[in-house]
């Protein structure tokens, strides 16, 4: 959780602040191939998630969410937003940042039934309010929200554990 989801959120918020002064770029409707691939993959995983939930295969459904998280982290590495910024490829950079925020919005909605507080925390940090009565309907489309402003400094949604402290704590409880 800490390495994947929390890191994805913090990296995204950091880039929105660094490259766009905290304002999420609007969707321009013309994604490049890498963006299209991410969109397609995300929708496929959401559909698998829905099918698995209907069959009460909760752990497998949760794995589909983590597949989206993993793929979105990989998307950062593939698109290299820091290079796009350095090369002043603003339109591509806007699309990358938009897609990162959009996938985090979808992830927050997907984890909501299992981790409601974490979902709310992610959405709050992204500056997103869920106004729709049925947010599930927005999962398979790009949400064209008006201006979104993220918080200035991302907050960890999960804290790293100190293994030695945890071992000592457990030993102390065991007597």
PLM features per residue range, with description:
Residues 1-92:
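Long, charged, mostly alpha-helical binding arms that flank functional sites
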Residues 51, 55-57, 66-175:
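Basic, alpha-helical terminal appendages of large translation-related enzymes
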């Amino acid at each position: 959780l800490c390495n994947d989801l929390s890191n994805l959120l913090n990296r995204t918020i950091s880039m929105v602040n660094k490259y766009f002064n905290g304002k999420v770029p609007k969707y321009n409707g013309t994604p490049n191939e890498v963006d299209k691939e991410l969109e397609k993959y995300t929708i496929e995983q959401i559909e698998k998630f829905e099918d698995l939930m209907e069959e009460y295969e909760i752990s497998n459904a949760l794995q589909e969410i983590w597949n989206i998280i993993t793929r979105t982290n990989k998307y950062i590495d593939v698109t290299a937003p820091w290079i796009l910024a350095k090369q002043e490829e603003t339109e591509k950079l806007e699309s990358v940042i938009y897609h990162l925020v959009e996938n985090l919005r979808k992830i927050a909605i997907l984890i909501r039934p299992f981790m409601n507080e974490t979902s709310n925390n992610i959405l709050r940090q992204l500056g997103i309010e869920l106004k729709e009565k049925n947010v599930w309907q927005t999962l398979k489309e790009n949400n064209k929200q008006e201006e979104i402003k993220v918080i200035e400094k991302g907050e960890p949604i999960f804290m790293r554990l100190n293994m030695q402290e945890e071992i000592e704590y457990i030993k102390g409880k065991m007597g």
